[in-house]
């Protein structure tokens, strides 16, 4: 037989595995030559370190067969014959009894293949089909085999055949002759070495490494193109294959993306055609197109029969039975026992899959619950975050309000001091007025007396003059006094007007404050309601979370139990897995032994084939001998023996394949189960982690909830402290009143009883003789009196308990009084703080007034300085103009003089004209300079205007600030008025507190009275007991006397009187109860009013604190504005200084220009006098020395200096 060229190539170390190779090229002449020469394969190759399956085609009988090869280079092999026959069916699919061997190159999922696959066995250029596929080694049976393109190995399970398509016509007729075979073998590859050594030594060039064209010559062009097209889809990863050949029936050309079944059997069909063609005559005969059909053996028919579904127990039994039955000589009963044992061992693995599904379902439920708990925790955290800012804001508001209240109290005290001072001043003024009026009356009386004296005494004229002087002086004094009085009255009127205005503002502020207080109170109520609701929700959520936590703990316990059970089961299954693994290794070793035996059989077959080939060569050498017939007979016998051996080998291979498949299936099942066990362990570990995290989260959430609840409880306690104290005081007052009323009623009852007892005693003393006969009735009365004594003792105990409770109530009232005193002290401190803040505000106001005045003064100074600078500039300009006029006049005079002289000197006119032109140019330049100076002047004027506007703006801003300050003062006055009102409210509260104290004192006095009454009652009781004892003794002495009628009537009358008294006392009791209820209602109303007033005061304090803060902010803004004005003032000062410097430079420049002009004028005059030349006309001279030109010169010089 021929060996593949890949065997000759050097190959690396190969692991144990199944290698599958498909050889489609016919037997070459070189190989036949090697067989003829008797070349024998070494025996050690059959026992190499690797094994595999190589599919080759033997071209003797025209039929292919499967050869088991060791996978090593040069290894021998033996084959199993594959028989074929024509099929008369027209459908194009394989029949159910087809015996086509499994083609490992038909379809393997997930691996790309080259588009052109070679069918030649000697093609070294093939990258896939030329190499043997390798399965897993014996050491790697426990783990899953890697499926990557680099390692192109696969198990026997993945190598399933596909349905065959209609192939080319194949002639299965008997061989034509031996001569044709000889010619066939001799015609191919003559110059090459034969046999395995030739393959080893021969290396084909790349040009000759092409696929065999043995079949392509017989196939039409369309089938070749179709095969080439189908080879591209040969390794589609989306393909799915079936393990049964008869189940796949598809058309030959399908447009679907799945590979065509033609690609699955293209190689087998080609090999069979090649085998048939190799034994035909050189002249090919025309053949009818028929469908392929292969002969079937009983083994393949048994494998292809309808079986149970793959996942059922029957299917597993059948597979295990087939595996154990193949190649064993045991009885059916022993084989079935083994099958049952294997199934029992595999049953727990199936159960593990169900247990793993349950664990996965439990894990899903746990994850859902974890998500729900996390959501709830997030919601609670959000609620807490929402409540925290409100709580913090309320605390801040409380602090701010307390600060504002303290500041307002200080302001109130300050205002009170100012009001007292104003009252003192008014009183002083009133005293002065009274004194002035008294002086006026005294002076009037003096005037009247003086007038009388004048009338009486008509003395000399000097005396009259003295008197008149005195009168005049007194009149002047009176006028001065009247003027002072008028001034004082005017001041009083102004003060009264201011007071009325303040009162009106205070009323408005009070109304606004009341509204604001109500609004704030409503907001506080809403906030408290929201807090209560949030607390209720938090408590509910906490309860829900606790319940869920308990559920989770129960679930965790159950999961832990399941984990322990699963761990035990996994240990058991691991032990079972190891046992199965050992059994599989044992079976693998048996398979290896069987394969070794197969290889030995193949070696023997190869030797026989070589012998036969030698004989054939000898027959060719001696064609005319008589031995030819015998050789042919021997050939037929050997062919029959080969067929039998091939059939046996095929059966053994099928059995081995089945065993391998079943073993691989069991291995895959065991691997899947092991993977599931590992996944379960990982899932259990993850579940434990998640449970720990859940516990930590629950603990954190519970801690956070506890903290939030504690904070909310503290807030609620703080808020409810005042309410609870007030309610407790009210309830205690009500209880005291009720107890007092009850005690009064009991005292009345006891007094009535005492009065009745005294009357009874008097009567009994008068009628001792009558009562002695009625001893029995009196004993009954004594029993009744004993019962009354018991009731009195119970009443006494009740009174003692009530007295104790009253004492406790008094102690509580004392504590409340202390708390109220502390609150009053705190209010006093807050008032002091308000006073201090008011003083600070006044000081800040004074500083602002001072700064504003200073800024106004500085602005005025700046304006005056700028005006003075302008005036100086204007005066300088006027001076310059006057000087220029004078110079022009002098120049005109000189010109007139020069005109007279020019008449004499007319010779130098030309020179003078040139000089005149030059002077004209100079005048034009001076005019330009003058224009620039005017422009500079205008710019300066504009700058001055801008500065004036800025000063005006600053003044306006200062006026606005002054207005704002006035507004602040008005607000402060309003706040002071509000403070006064708050002081009034505080005074009212103190009055109410005093009233409560008075009521407490009254209650104490009443309690003392009750105690004294109780002592009196006890004394009366003692006296009654003594009287009872006396009566008992008297009754004992007067037992013999009997007067029942009179005593009975008297006792009945006494009973009626007592009943009437009891009814009257009950009526009084009802009246007292009604009065007590009314009083209780009044007390409750008073407590509610007190609470409202306290809240009102607190709200007012908060508002005042807010207003004080707003005023502080306004003061800060005013200070910032003042700083900004200072900066602007400094900028203005800098600009003025720069202007002064520019003016000084201009003045210096003007002086220098004046000097230059005087020098030029003197020089021109000297030249004119020296030359004695006259001008043409006076007009030209006047035009040259025009005053405007001189002014332009001056302005030009000024502009130059300014530009510098």
Swiss-Prot record:
Deletion of the TJP1/ZO1 interaction motif (ZIM) decreases but does not abolish colocalization with TJP1/ZO1. This is Cingulin. One of its GO terms (molecular function) is microtubule binding. Residues 54-67 are annotated as: Interaction with TJP1/ZO1. Residues 7-359 are annotated as: Head. Homodimer. Interacts with TJP1/ZO1 and SPEF1. Pfam families: Myosin_tail_1. Residues 360-1161 form a coiled coil. One of its GO terms (biological process) is microtubule cytoskeleton organization. A motif (ZIM) lies at residues 48-62. It comes from the Eukaryota. The gene is CGN. It is found in: Cell junction, Tight junction.
